[in-house]
């Protein structure tokens, strides 16, 4: 799957140069933007785990090594930020204390790469006795009461399970 992304981009570049009638002297640049899967509440994939930090990093490394053409540029979200996104997307009330402690450690403008300090977030989790992987990397069972199960979001649990099963069957 991962290598196939870059292979497809290379085919686009190759097709451009094989196209007759294209303007000569012009170059092509294909930008490949990839996103890490982040399970979100109220979706059929809320039950799925996110890849671990190490798995995400490995996929990014495969992508980087697979790009051999200067005609292809690669963009992706930082692994540590994706992990935190999954943690807070599927988290519960206990994360409030983690947020507060991270804030006290200076985590305020984390959407800016130069202001993001993953190590401070990990310290805050440790101080609170919480493991980010419990939230991000754990498969949830269909009968688990989720932190957002009490909310009415207009879609039934049965519908989400049905859509999840259809997606796995590629329907």
For each predicted feature, which ranges?
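Short catalytic/ligand-binding loop motif for oxyanion handling, primarily in non-cytosolic enzymes
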Residues: 40-43, 83-85
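Conserved C-terminal portion of the radical SAM core fold
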Residues: 1-41, 55-79
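Radical SAM enzyme core and accessory elements
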Residues: 64, 68-171
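Glycine- and acidic
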Residues: 42-49, 141-146
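Short secondary-structure boundary/capping segments
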Residues: 1-6, 45-56, 88-95
